[in-house]
Curated annotation (Swiss-Prot):
Region feature Disordered, mapped onto this chain: 691-710
Top enzyme class: transferase
Function of the molecule: Involved in mRNA degradation. Catalyzes the phosphorolysis of single-stranded polyribonucleotides processively in the 3'- to 5'-direction.
Coiled coil: none
Catalytic activity reported: RNA(n+1) + phosphate = RNA(n) + a ribonucleoside 5'-diphosphate
Domain S1 motif as annotated: residue spans: 625-693
Major place of residence: cytoplasm
Cofactor list: Mg(2+)
GO molecular function: 3'-5'-RNA exonuclease activity; magnesium ion binding; polyribonucleotide nucleotidyltransferase activity; RNA binding
Gene: pnp
EC code(s) of this entry: 2.7.7.8
Protein name: Polyribonucleotide nucleotidyltransferase
Keywords: Cytoplasm, Magnesium, Metal-binding, Nucleotidyltransferase, RNA-binding, Transferase
GO CC, one annotated term: cytosol
């Protein structure tokens, strides 16, 4: 296929799609140019069904530093592992695409997005999401799209689609919404305490804008789209299924209704193992034993899936016996750990998170050097999910995509209520350790983070709580669940996380397993989430009503002084020599910004006070009219040089030593002698003239003798 180009305008910027020129051996490939951002997307599919009980979809978002005209950092000067932003963007694209593949599809699919040029005012992630959907849609991969996504901002009561950098900085909302022509299927948002009504309207505005992008994709697919390949879907033997359901459905139904998680898992596992043992023995000699046992496992999964959903939708019974809108038992604790700067332990049923606060000088902020201009990140929220939290063994190592994503969600939820840098000049790190998990651990980490911040004396604007909402839908009827647990998440259709204060929402995240959800479901879920959020905030505020007025004794104290900008180099010294000497002497940490604000950090107040004295001395300037107790440091024929303070000397001219005539300076003064002087002049070069005689009363003039007249 020769190169074909398709052009439109979206949100005030040109959107150009090129097909047929590059990456032609992929199943589908596009080059998307949005503004001056250019993204190459290639989609490929394996020829055979993969083994395993899940759909092996991999979405990558690769940031090439040349796209922004930069050299990669590090010794190797080559792109390494994806940045956090790249990982989050890959997840952002994966989530709306994944539900658009058929149930039982098991061929491996890879969607690789490479940013070739970067324009900070034209969203490369949104171009990559568009390109991912289009590459799949024009390929022979059986993708039931297209989908598209947009960013939505909110400024002065107006919604803005795909805001530029300046607009986003002024926006009260940073929302990414994706979906198909029919419905929304992915949401990711941070917001400055906006109401449910505003958030819902933003979602609908975003979905409305998506229609334009989907129509553009459909236009392109009609011209260059390939016929979809026939692939084998994972389907179980219907006779085998009927046999197992008839024999064991009642036993599995009973096991599913055991309320306690571990007991329920043991009961369901016992039924499954009994079934597997029977059929493994029955078909031991069959050459298709592996396929049969795969089908047995899949049938049992489907039976459990169906029973959980039936109980909720028909009987209105949840696996643990709760009502549809009931939250699990809550518990909140502060000061769980000694010595640290703040800690909070939050428990919701069998989900438990410990959050630990660390405060540090601003010099500890994280420097982010990606495609965007380098910036410093003051607040970090890290989320760890060890396998012991679910009673299992597993991989330990660097944080995976899920942990990075959950940490980022908590970060967005909490950063909206943090004090400004002027109010609280600290770098802030929260680490959430998930100690138990039975669903909604990311929301537990937000609640624990609120406890740790308030316990640590961080003056947040308001406490934040999070809740996860679920959905069971049969296409006609649906049930919205409050505070979903693991089983409801696994077998449900939606995981909709809502975090916020009593004033409004600070973060949203939604993932679904069906094609999309309606505005009515969104509205109902937001309303139930608000009620639940207030219940959780009641528990948090009963534990600690407001941030403590003081920091923990172990936290670094801070004092700030202001110096003239032209004195910054004096405090730092050549090659940092002066500031390093101060730090070595006092043991403090010092940050100096470009405006001359000097922040001094230490757990020892005496060390802070001593540092302030040293810096004040370094930046001190002589002033005309002020008197100084000085020391003679050099004598010349024309006068004496005296040291006023630190590195500031002044000249006392020979005529300014005394009111009487001084013939020889050394007859009056000697090096090392202490004298009081008054500054009488500072010239344009900063040279200081001082006087000793100005401090001595001027002797009266001798009376003139009267002349005698004869």
């Amino acid at each position: 296929m020769s190169k074909q180009t398709f052009t439109t305008t979206f949100a005030g910027k040109p959107l150009v799609v090129e097909v047929g020129q590059v990456a032609k051996q992929a199943n589908g490939a596009t080059v998307v140019r949005y503004g001056d951002s250019t993204v190459l997307t290639a989609a490929v599919m394996s020829k055979k069904m993969a083994t395993g009980d899940f759909f092996p979809l991999q979405v990558n978002y690769e940031e090439k530093m040349y796209a922004a005209g930069k050299f990669p950092g590090g010794f190797m000067k080559r792109e390494g592992r994806p940045s956090t932003d790249a990982t989050l963007t890959a997840r952002l694209i994966d989530r709306p695409i994944r539900p658009m593949f058929a149930e039982g599809f098991r061929n491996e699919v890879q969607v690789i997005n490479t940013v070739l040029s970067y324009d900070e005012n034209a969203s490369a992630p949104m171009a990559a999401m568009f390109g991912s959907s289009l590459a799949l849609s024009i390929s022979d991969i059986p993708f039931n799209g297209p989908i598209a996504g947009v960013q939505v901002g909110y400024i002065d009561g107006e919604f803005i689609i795909n805001p530029d950098k300046e607009q986003m900085e002024a926006s009260l909302l940073e929302l990414t919404v994706a979906g198909s022509k029919e419905a929304i299927n992915m949401v990711e948002s941070g917001a400055k305490e906006l109401s449910e009504d505003i958030m819902l309207e933003a979602l609908l505005k975003g979905h409305q804008a998506i229609q334009e992008l989907i129509a553009f994709q459909e236009q392109i697919v009609a011209v260059v789209g390939k016929e979809k390949a026939e692939v084998e879907l994972l389907q179980v033997d219907v006779d085998l299924q009927a046999d197992i359901v008839a024999k064991y459905n009642a036993q599995l139904q009973k096991a599913v209704q055991v309320e306690e998680k571990k007991a329920r898992e043991a009961a369901t596992e016992a039924v499954k193992e009994m079934v597997k043992a029977e059929y493994e023995e029955r078909y031991a000699e069959d050459e298709n034993l592996a396929t049969i046992m795969r089908d047995v496992a899949e049938i049992l999964e489907q039976m459990e899936h169906a029973e959980v959903r039936r109980l909720i939708t028909e009987d209105k019974i949840r696996p643990d016996g709760r009502k549809i809108d009931e939250i699990r038992p809550l518990d909140a604790v502060v000061d769980f750990l000694p010595k640290v700067h703040g800690s909070g332990l939050f428990t919701r049923g069998q989900t438990q998170a410990l959050s630990v606060l660390t405060l540090a000088p601003m010099g500890e902020t994280q420097i982010i050097d990606g495609l965007a201009p380098e910036y410093k990140k003051r607040f970090l929220h890290h989320y760890n999910f060890p396998q012991y939290s679910v009673g299992e063994t597993g991989r330990y190592g660097a944080a995976g995509r899920r942990e990075i994503g959950h940490g980022a969600l908590g970060e967005r939820a909490l950063e909206q209520v943090l004090p400004s840098l002027e109010e609280f000049p600290y770098a802030i790190r929260l680490v959430a350790e998930v100690l138990e998990s039975n669903g909604s651990s990311s929301q537990a980490s937000i609640c624990a983070g609120t406890l740790a911040l308030m316990a640590g004396g961080v003056p947040i604007k308001a406490p934040v709580a999070g809740i996860a909402m679920g959905l069971i839908s049969d296409g006609t009827n649906y049930t919205v669940l409050t505070d979903i647990q693991g089983l409801e998440d696994h077998f449900g259709d939606m995981d909709f996380k809502v975090a916020g204060t009593r004033e409004g929402i600070t973060a949203l995240q939604m993932d679904i397993k069906i094609a999309g959800i309606t505005p009515q479901i969104l509205e109902e879920a937001l309303a139930q989430a608000k009620k639940a959020r207030f219940e959780i905030l009641d528990v948090i505020e009963a534990t600690i009503a407001e941030p403590r007025p003081e920091l923990a004794p172990t936290a670094p104290k801070i004092d700030t002084i202001k110096i003239d900008v032209d004195k910054i180099k004096v405090v730092i010294g050549k090659g940092g020599e002066t500031i390093d000497k101060i730090i070595a002497e006092t043991g403090v940490k010092i940050d100096i910004d470009d405006e001359g604000n000097v922040s001094i950090y230490s757990s020892d107040q005496a060390a802070i006070d001593r540092t302030k004295e040293i810096i004040a001395g370094l930046v001190r300037e002589a002033k005309v009219g002020e008197v100084y107790h000085a020391k003679v440091v050099r004598i010349e024929k024309f006068g004496a040089f005296v040291n006023l303070f630190d590195k500031t000397d002044a000249l006392v001219h020979i005529s300014e030593i005394a009111w009487t005539r001084t013939t020889n300076v050394s007859d009056v003064l000697e090096v090392g002698e202490d004298v009081d002087v008054k500054v009488i002049k500072i010239d344009e070069k900063g040279r200081v003239d001082a006087s000793m005689k100005a401090l001595i009363p001027r002797p009266p003039k001798p009376e003139k003798k009267e002349e005698k007249h004869d």
